[in-house]
Design a protein with these regions (language model features):
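Conserved thiamine diphosphate
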Residues: 1-93
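Thiamine diphosphate
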Residues: 11-12, 63-204
Length: 204
């Protein structure tokens, strides 16, 4: 089991040398590797327990920033390889992971969109395909490179069974930079407003 902390650009002032935006892509290529990127402290605890009980390799990705509690509903249940539907919608499906789940939910509230908190590997193909069939459009949101991460995993799942337009929101093909975490998330359009604007443009 591998636990990685301070992932993504939200490490902030530590800068590009400390910002890992490629780790998920690297880990996805390892056979049998399970990748978990919890959205809040509730899910983080559930992920640690699931990793401990799982008989195989697991990569746990933890962010640095404090995030809102999302998974505090009485019916919340974490399962490896299963996404959690946080909001029902009809116009577009937003699939997010890690700290970007809160940004995605903020955008989804304004856009009448589905909101799904996803494990990355194994990806919940059944849930994602069903949601894509319902809305006809999918957006992925992650604090990671748009190359090889959640967006790529979702595209892999949809390509054969439900090819629909997909917008991948994340760090483009660039290195990070130094700055306050909130400012960097805004610059890379990974905060709630940035996600909202990109999804709105995609849905025109």
């Amino acid at each position: 089991k591998i636990g990685a902390t301070h992932a993504g650009i939200s490490v902030g002032e530590d800068g590009a040398t400390h910002q890992c935006n490629e780790d998920i892509a690297l880990m996805r290529t390892i056979p049998g590797m399970v990748i978990l990127n919890p959205a809040d402290d509730v899910e983080a605890k559930a992920c640690v327990k699931a990793a401990y009980e799982y008989n195989g390799p697991v990569y746990l990705r933890f962010g640095r920033l404090a995030v809102p509690v999302i998974n505090d509903r009485p019916d919340y249940k974490f399962e490896l390889g299963k996404g959690v539907v946080l909001r029902e919608g009809k116009d577009v499906t937003i699939v997010a992971t890690g700290l970007c789940v809160s940004s995605a939910l903020e955008a989804a509230e304004k856009l009448a969109a589905d909101g799904i908190d996803a494990t990355i590997k194994p990806i919940d193909e059944e849930l994602i395909v069903a949601a894509a069939k319902e809305t006809g459009k999918v957006v992925t949101v992650e604090e990671h490179s748009v190359i090889g991460g959640l967006g790529s995993a979702v595209c892999d799942a949809l390509a054969e069974k439900c090819p629909v337009p997909v917008k991948k929101i994340g760090v483009q093909d660039v290195f990070g930079e130094s700055g306050p975490a909130a400012a960097l998330l805004a610059k890379y359009k990974l905060d709630g407003e940035g996600v909202y604007e990109q999804v709105k443009e995609f849905c025109k």
